Structure formats: C-alpha cells, structure tokens
Amino acid sequence: MQSIKYHLRQTKINMNRTDRIERITAITDKTTDWKQQIPWKGELKSMPVYDIPLDLLVYNKYNGRILSRTKSLENQKQKIDVESDSGKKIIEKLLWDSKEERNKKTQISIANFGQQKVGIITKDGIIIDGNRRAMLLNDIQNDGFLSKKKLPKKYNYFKAVVLPVTLEENPIEIEELETKFQMGEDEKLGYNATEKYLKAKEIYLRLTKSSKIILNELNDEAIKKISDWMGETNSEVRKYMNTMVLMDEYLNYLEYDGIYTQLDSREDQFLSLTKWLNTFYGSESKKGFDGYDDTDVDDLKTIAFDFLRIRNSYDGKEFRNLAEGNKEKHFFGNKEIWNNFSTKHFETLDRIPEESEIDFNTNNLEKHLNARDNEFFETSKFGKSESEFIENINNNKTLVGYNRASDAPEKLVKKASQAFDAIKTGHSSFSKPTVQNLIEELGTKVISSLKDKSTSKVLDHIINLLESIDIDKIPDAEVEKVKLISKKITSYCYHNFDKGL
C-alpha cells in the first residue's frame, strides 16, 4: 500500500503540471510570426515558436545525452524526481559534466546573443529537445553555480516549439521526434559513445514491449523504425543491439548490472569483441586456431572482459592482440600461443585476492567502482612494476612476432643474441637455479639446432667450451665431479668417434 506522503507528492506534481499547462496555453494562445519546421506525425509541419519562461520547463531525465548516467543512478535505487529542486540539480550537473568545455563556450554565446537553436517541449513543459540549452540558461540565472562564472542575465526564457500533447498522451510519437533531433548525424557527435547503444535498446524495448533483447529473435519492424529515427542503416542498428547485449553481459560479469557509467572509454573494444564472438562462435573460422571450439571462445570472452575492466590502465590498441585480424596476427590464431596466454591469464586471476564487496550505497558509485577496478589492476602486479596481465600480453606478442618471422631465421637469431647480450650476468639473480636452468635449456636448444645441420660445428663448439674452462678456478666441491665427466667424455669419444668412423 502506498504511503500518504507518496499520494501528497503525486497531488502536488499534478497541481504543478496543471499550472504549467495553463500558463503555457496562455502563451501559445497568442499569435507569433516565428515558425519552425519539425517532423510530426509522419510529415514536416511548420509550428510556431514561443518564448517560454524558464520556471515552466521540466528536464527530460532520459535525454540521450545523459541516459547512461540517469539509468546508472536509478539502478542504484536513487530516485530522480525532475519536479523537485534536488532532482533538477542532479540533471543540471549531469548535463554540465557531459561536455564541460563545450558547455562553457555555448553558455557565453547564449549569454551574449541568446539561444540560437530552437527547442521543443510538450504542452506541460517537458523538454523533448534542448535540455542542455535550458540548463545553460538556468545556470546563467543562478549566477553561474555550475560554470563558476557570472554572465549577463539578458535572456530568462527558452525559445521552443510547443507540442499539442503531453508525454503520456503520445509517448511513441514523442520518442520518434526526440530521437530524430537528439541522435541525428550532426547531434551524435556531441554524445557520450555509450548513449547511442543504450538509446537504441530503450527504444527497442518500448516498441516491442519486451523486457530484454533476444538477438536471434530481433523484431524487423522495430529495427527499421529505430534505423529511420536514428538515421542509421538496419545493419548498424542490429550491431547496436549486439553490442549493447554484450555490454550488459560485461556489467553482469562484474556485478555492475545497470551501472552504465562503467562502459565509458570502451566502445572500440566492445565493437571488436562483438565482431570476434560473431566470427568464432558456432563455427570454425579460418581466423582462429585449428580445432578450437565454443569453450575456447568462452575463454576469449572472459579474458576480454578482464582486459575491458582494466582498459584505463593500458593502451587500448593492445586489446587487438587477443583476436583481431587474420590468424597469424593474434593470440587466438595459434593454439600453442593461445594455450600459453590463456593459462597464464587464469593463473594470474586465481592469485589475485578476493575483492571486497561493492558498496552500492556510496555517494559516488562511479568513483567507487573506478577505484575498485584500479585496485584489481594494481594487485595484479604482485609487488612488481608491471601487471602480470600486461606482461602476458607483451610476452605473447613477441611469440606472435616470432611466428610471423619464422621464414626469416637470421633476424630472429640476431634478436635472440641481442636479448641475451642485454642480460646482466654479473647480477646476483643470474646465479639462481631457476635462471641457470633456463640458460641450460636455451643452450640445449641452440646445440640441438646446430647438430641437425653440422656435426663438425657442434664439435668445434664443444672444443671451444672446453678450452675456455680455467681449471685452476674449478671449485673444490666440483673437482671430483669434473674428473668423472672428463673421463666420460674421453670414453664417449673413443667408442663413438674413433671406432665408429
């Protein structure tokens, strides 16, 4: 049962709406010579433009420019009441922060010359197009609370076309109009990258009256409408749907469901991953290693999600190493490299301590989650200067490079020699058993490659090694062992070379 407080609040909202409708109607009853053409009910209509007092305007909290922000707040159970002063301040702050530098320039222009682009509102004052301009006008009247700059207060009204309906009376028609104005080709340039995906999802769910997007059952009619409204092709809108579903899955993976702010700065990586999964799932693509299956693609997605999470801690172009391009260019194209890379990744993941619980009640969830993601990255360093996730990328990038240059052994051998020359053999860590074992393993590989091509070169190399030994410097603890080995060498040479040749 709803509270008395709720009913009182609704009564006040209805009274405010009624008052706004009456006052706006009094304005629109007057004649005006200024007209603006807008698409309405399937045709381009010439509608009058009026000067609407700022106090009659109500922000649209689902404006495409800040949709990811308002949805994120609401998914934190934070109610945004656009009729209240507190709700109004939240929307204004989100609008200001969405493009601060651009807002500063536009606000100066508006203060000096007035609003140059006409907005659109409903008959009860809900802003359909022009949230940002209205916010800038309000901020000027509020002595630059957001901009921290006092500007001339010459314009205390909003130039707008007034639609003959409320939002509730014709939601689909208004959605179409709003989308065409907000997400047209010119406007999209000023929007956060995530907004267009989220906007397409919201429209699709509203048109189809669905609770979620099912990719293999997309409604063609809804896709066509969205493509018309957004000025995109059908295939582009389908790509939006695919990408948005993956974005939601990523947020679910991190338990950040509905917190769309955590998608910022990751659009390129999501587009790449969406393309990879469409390529690899369900069939064996020539771009993947031979014999991979869907469980390998599952691993690719999980690993990609981890690298999406730490996206702000490395150059985003490195993400391409996972699976971008032809098979010889990436990790997923070579079975040995992929197994090496994925095994190391999951080993690193297992070593990271369990993370603390997410504090969904924090005042700034975006900051809290960013700090949490950064801690995840820092922990992966395990006291070293570089994250093991990044080390793993770099190490396997080298292997991919070696594979691609396998037809040029001279270059690879030179690189290997230069790499070995760079090692500080006098450093104490060089004597560690693990390092010495690796050196021995490397030496065995070198000798093995020589013996297949030239036995005499191997023997010459052995003689050079024997001649380089300073007998006087052999440690006492090794003398007896050296004697045994030297006898073994003599015996081996006698029985295998003197008698055999």
Q: Which residues are covered by each model-predicted region?
A:
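Charge-dense, extended regions
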Residues: E391-L501
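Amphipathic, charge-rich alpha-helical segments that serve as recognition/docking helices
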Residues: L94, P152-M244
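An acidic, glycine-rich, mixed-charge low-complexity segment common to nucleic-acid enzymes
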Residues: M1-I38, L44, V237, P433, ...
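Glycine/serine-rich loop-strand microenvironments at binding/catalytic pocket rims
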Residues: E101-D124, D293-V297, F307-K335
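Amphipathic alpha-helical "recognition" segments
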Residues: F145-F158, Y197, R206, G231-N326, ...
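C-terminal structural cap/anchor segments
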Residues: E336-G426
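Short, charged/polar connector segments at secondary-structure boundaries
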Residues: S3-K150
